Amino acid sequence: MVSKLTSLQQELLSALLSSGVTKEVLIQALEELLPSPNFGVKLETLPLSPGSGADLDTKPVFHTLTNGHAKGRLSGDEGSEDGDDYDTPPILKELQALNTEEAAEQRAEVDRMLSEDPWRAAKMIKGYMQQHNIPQREVVDVTGLNQSHLSQHLNKGTPMKTQKRAALYTWYVRKQREILRQFNQTVQSSGNMTDKSSQDQLLFLFPEFSQQNQGPGQSEDTCSEPTNKKMRRNRFKWGPASQQILYQAYDRQKNPSKEEREALVEECNRAECLQRGVSPSKAHGLGSNLVTEVRVYNWFANRRKEEAFRQKLAMDAYSSNQTHNLNPLLTHGSPHHQPSSSPPNKMSGVRYNQPGNNEVTSSSTISHHGNSAMVTSQSVLQQVSPASLDPGHSLLSPDSKMQITVSGGGLPPVSTLTNIHSLSHHNPQQSQNLIMTPLSGVMAIAQSLNTSQAQGVPVINSVASSLAALQPVQFSQQLHSPHQQPLMQQSPGSHMAQQPFMAAVTQLQNSHMYAHKQEPPQYSHTSRFPSAMVVTDTSSINTLTSMSSSKQCPLQAW
């Protein structure tokens, strides 16, 4: 006997014997601790001192609880497998108290399951619960088992004590018979249940009738009802068969009509009955798992809300990513709009002196796109004396100050012209340098020049954001260059003096008045484009005098 005990058990026995407990007293205590035939458990504290040995002859006390919980008992996953420290649950007490034939059959079934493999029985119970959508909470409420221990026993085969397994098997046998009775109910009984439920609803709406019709016997029954209504009502749970049907219907129609929902109700109830192995005509036996039209409506509404929420999350994530990607571009600038890297000698300063000593300071950025260098002008007019120069004609000129000086004669506001220079790293044959100037200055040039030819020049209607459309403007004057040499001689090193257009506009030294054209060109949407700019190519400005009056430059779009 001693050889089968562990070292800890041997130490415990030695401690008991050394405390004064005799062999006979120890054997008697062990016999009293054995389980009784009615599944009762005798709990008695063994004496730890010799003086308490006289009290061992007292009768043992059965500690039973109605709810299956006790302060001194171990938790569901503690103790050995065959420990007897688990109190008798109410379900076992009820089964033992019944003397009917049905109770005897249930006890025989429980004994048979206890004698079989626990893991095999656990898998059978788990499959039955999944088939009928039974939550583990219901088993815990009835048997008093620990839910964590129950889940581990059903899913992993964790060892469970005999008393606990007996309670679990008792619940399983009873649940089988209960569900079988539900599905075997006749249609008449189902109608009676419907009438009873409608009567209960009327009594709920008008409680005064229930108080008047309630007799003394009914009040006693009401007092005894709370003990039977401690268990919570099972929450409705969608089965896998119904979910598959609903998801397929959701793919076809996200918001079905009432007729479609009713058809889905019949289809889901039929699938639930087939899942449980019963005829679809017995759908009323589903009980709390019965699918209704309201539940189908709520299911579709919840799916639509979930889909809308997922779409919102996706759009928020996309917008945040776009903002994150744009931050470096806003701080460092676009790679297609980097400032020009031309040498400083290309930005030589030139100054025009008019009688009023007017100075126009501007700054511009050269943007590179492909092989052509486009000059985007955004100037800030600081001091402008000619009254005909509209302050709205603001252009940005190069970063380096451009000052042009010419002695004698008044000039049109060509000082607002941008500093055009050829880039050293671009092919000059492929570069196309454009000059932008206010339309008022161009009209003054057109009035002061003397020619018989007409030439079309594309005009850009400038707005604050430089977004415009080009239109042709007719010139009826001729360019002649009697004063080109003085300008080129005064500033031989100037880059602006080498441009034909800049040399051509300096011939108006004797003109001090800005003549206005009698028939100005018509522009579309003049209210939206109050000012206009002339854009032309510096390499082709010398061809203005040679082109015929019937030719016009094609319209360009920004």
Swiss-Prot record:
UniProt-listed Pfam families: HNF-1_N, HNF-1B_C
Query: Residue ranges of region Dimerization?
Result: 1-31
Give the chief site where it resides: nucleus
Which SUPFAM superfamilies does the UniProt record give? Dimerization cofactor of HNF-1 alpha, Homeodomain-like, lambda repressor-like DNA-binding domains
Q: Region Disordered: start and end of each range?
A: 66-85, 323-348
Q: Which residues bind DNA?
A: 231-311
Task: List UniProt keywords, sorted A-Z.
Answer: Activator, DNA-binding, Homeobox, Nucleus, Phosphoprotein, Transcription, Transcription regulation
Q: What is the effect of changing residue 222 to A?
A: In strain: NSY
Residue numbers of Phosphoserine PTMs: 49, 52, 75, 80
GO-annotated cellular components: cytosol; nucleoplasm; nucleus; transcription regulator complex
Give the family from UniProt.
Belongs to the HNF1 homeobox family.
Give the function comment from the record. Answer: Transcription factor that binds to the inverted palindrome 5'-GTTAATNATTAAC-3'. Binds to the FPC element in the cAMP regulatory unit of the PLAU gene. Transcriptional activity is increased by coactivator PCBD1.
Q: How does it assemble?
A: Binds DNA as a dimer. Can form homodimer or heterodimer with HNF1-alpha. Interacts (via HNF-p1 domain) with PCBD1; the interaction increases its transactivation activity.
* Protein name stated in the entry: Hepatocyte nuclear factor 1-beta
